Amino acid sequence: MLIDIHDLHVQFEQGKQAKHVVKGINLHVQQGETFSLIGRSGCGKSTILRVIAGLLTHWQGNMSLLGQTIKPQQRFQGALRRNIQMVFQDPYASLHPQHRIERAFSEPLKIHQIPFDKDTIKQALAQVGLPADVTSRYPHQLSGGQRQRVAIARALLLQPQLLLLDEPTSALDMSVQAEILNLLNTLKKEHNMTYLLVSHDADVIAHMSDRAALMENGELTQHYDREALSKGIHRLD
């Protein structure tokens, strides 16, 4: 089991009160599958991704990731940090506007003490359909689809086992969305990765997922297998 979560709770302080945003969920994801969380904005989907990515450490419950027991307030380090990567909804926000794309690639390599190798970066870009000269450009010189491809390529540099996808195509035009989704499916097979996808788009969920769960008000209220997703039973009213 790549992700094994029991009774996960997350609360945020709001003045003198606490807002309970994730309420005792159980989540189990097998190696090699794409599991998706579908739900409206604000239901807690992205909060779960942030917990699993190690970006949010104030939670309660029991969690195992990649066979390793995780404790609240634990900092992800070493192989665990390298093997769990995240692609955000807006790649522009994760790329420094005054840094060339080459620097965006060099930073994760430096963090994990991996030698900087232009051939490796060139290969990562080629896998997502981008030319090598992209590294000399700034984020604002790229289209939204190109920036998302850069974000995916940067995550692939570290050869993660688990890729967390937070609304990865919602900021893109429909035609570009399809290209990115097909690219993600291809890369998953080539690299034997596991995906945890968050989306409010039923078509994206159906296209990508082996299984999915509906999240409402901080709880997982329904689960869908591949057959149910194919029939569109997961569609929100």
Question: For each predicted feature, which ranges?
Answer:
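ABC ATPase NBD Q-loop/coupling interface
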Residues: 13, 62-79, 182
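Helix-to-loop junction immediately C-terminal to a conserved catalytic motif
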Residues: 53
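ABC ATPase NBD coupling module
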Residues: 69-85, 111, 229-232
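Conserved ABC ATPase "signature" region
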Residues: 118-133
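Conserved ABC ATPase signature
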Residues: 138-142, 146
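A short, proline-enriched helix->beta-strand linker immediately N-terminal to the Walker B motif
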Residues: 157-161
